[in-house]
Amino acid sequence: MSSKSQLTYTARAQSHPNPLARKLFQVAEEKKSNVTVSADVTTTKELLDLADPSTGLGPYIAVIKTHIDILSDFSQETIDGLNALAQKHNFLIFEDRKFIDIGNTVQKQYHNGTLRISEWAHIINCSILPGEGIVEALAQTAQATDFPYGSERGLLILAEMTSKGSLATGAYTSASVDIARKYPSFVLGFVSTRSLGEVESTEAPASEDFVVFTTGVNLSSKGDKLGQQYQTPQSAVGRGADFIISGRGIYAAADPVEAAKQYQQQGWEAYLARVGAQ
């Protein structure tokens, strides 16, 4: 798989075939941040307080990652509040739903039901364990002629995981790349621990530029008791991450705002070093 990680976000935005990827890179450049905060909180108030720039992390992040199904009080107020903050303060919303089912089911999970994820989440993710049909089904939903947000929706394929003993390796990771290539207008890229440029897969078109999100970024810990394995912003970006994802390292810090600033600074400096701008 080809990699354009040595190019600046601005250069990649100018030539990227995916409209949401262009928006994502533009947000990163405008805010000088490649930080995604994983907001693993359990109430609407906690979520909105975390995102609100007047009291929280909004100025320092490019993306907020939600686990909306762990909120104990999810309602339309949750979505209205989150959307308002995202629009006003220039960050994208990534719902970490990890879709993994047959196509007919994931279409309903994405577009219908109580959560109505398609209406508010710019970015979603899925595993390809069910096969290519899961990506095709999600793409059909997001790109339907009667769906008004198609150009503002995109998918990350879960190509690797940071948990100890993960089985998302080898042939599974290669298949993730192969499937992604078939849906360039919908698949933004991957959740992975590194650039997938060395993964053996089908031949890459010259215009290919998949975005890499790396989870498990933490400045103060190397892991937890449940098998999570962490890396620093510098090591993640050095291995090819375009956007670094940190949860407890930020929201569970003694001062989450100061922690977010630190991740923003270190992540951005690592990016500048990678592209030779520092």
From Swiss-Prot:
Catalytic-site annotation from UniProt: K98
Catalytic activity: orotidine 5'-phosphate + H(+) = UMP + CO2
Gene Ontology MF, one: orotidine-5'-phosphate decarboxylase activity
One Pfam family here: OMPdecase
CDD domains: OMP_decarboxylase_like (cd04725)
Residues involved in substrate binding: 40, 65-67, 96-105, 230, 248
Keywords assigned by UniProt, alphabetized: Decarboxylase, Lyase, Pyrimidine biosynthesis
Functional pathway: Pyrimidine metabolism; UMP biosynthesis via de novo pathway; UMP from orotate: step 2/2
Keyword check for Lyase: yes
InterPro entries: Aldolase_TIM, OMPdecase, OMPdecase_AS, OMPdeCOase_dom, RibuloseP-bd_barrel
Any GO BP annotation: 'de novo' UMP biosynthetic process
Entry keyword annotation includes Lyase: yes
Source domain of life: Eukaryota
Enzyme Commission code(s) on record: 4.1.1.23
Family under the similarity heading: Belongs to the OMP decarboxylase family.
Protein's UniProt name: Orotidine 5'-phosphate decarboxylase
Annotated source species: Penicillium chrysogenum (Penicillium notatum)
